């Protein structure tokens, strides 16, 4: 059993785990759309996307929780592409690059999703924005 919490301030790290150092799985297990998933940082991001119909969203509980082992499991499950949608801040963009490099090691392609608004993230998207995103990703 493990617990995860997230700070609501600018404190780093954003995500705290108990017991310290525990590695949580990617959550939830989903059916891919066109052999792909959307990877987001936090639980509220994934809840918002699922609630608005983008049901192949998966949360990593923070960038440092993504490992080649977890990506290999996704590959075995048939995932061929990960659409990375991390927070649109400097840390999120660095995290997107780190995840892209890990995905290259296991032959999973990536696309980076970024909104022009610095503060836009998956947890703050409206229904209209999620519909547009889904249409752009999957037609």
Regions found by a protein language model. Give the residues of each.
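Short, aromatic/basic amphipathic alpha-helical patches
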Residues: 94-105
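A generic structural motif
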Residues: 109-119
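Acidic, metal-coordinating catalytic cores used for nucleic-acid/nucleotide bond scission
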Residues: 63-67, 86-96
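Phosphate-handling DNA/RNA-contact segment within nucleic-acid enzymes
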Residues: 1-77
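Short, small/acidic-rich helices and loops at N termini and domain boundaries
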Residues: 120, 124-139
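Acidic beta-strand-to-loop metal/phosphate-binding motif
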Residues: 39, 80-91, 114
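Hydrophobic anchor at the start of a short beta-strand
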Residues: 56-57, 82, 109-111
């Amino acid at each position: 059993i493990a617990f995860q919490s997230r700070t609501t301030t600018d404190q780093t790290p954003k995500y705290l785990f108990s017991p310290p150092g525990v590695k949580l799985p990617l959550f939830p297990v989903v059916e891919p759309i066109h052999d792909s998933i959307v990877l987001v940082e936090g639980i509220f991001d994934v809840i918002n996307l699922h609630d608005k119909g983008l049901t192949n969203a998966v949360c990593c509980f923070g960038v440092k929780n993504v490992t080649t082992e977890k990506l290999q499991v996704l590959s075995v499950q048939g995932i061929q592409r990960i659409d990375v949608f991390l927070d649109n801040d400097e840390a999120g963009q660095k995290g997107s690059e780190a995840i892209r490099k890990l995905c290259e090691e296991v032959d999973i392609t990536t696309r980076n999703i970024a909104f022009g608004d610095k503060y836009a993230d998956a947890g703050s998207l409206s229904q209209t924005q999620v519909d547009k995103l889904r249409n752009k990703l999957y037609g």
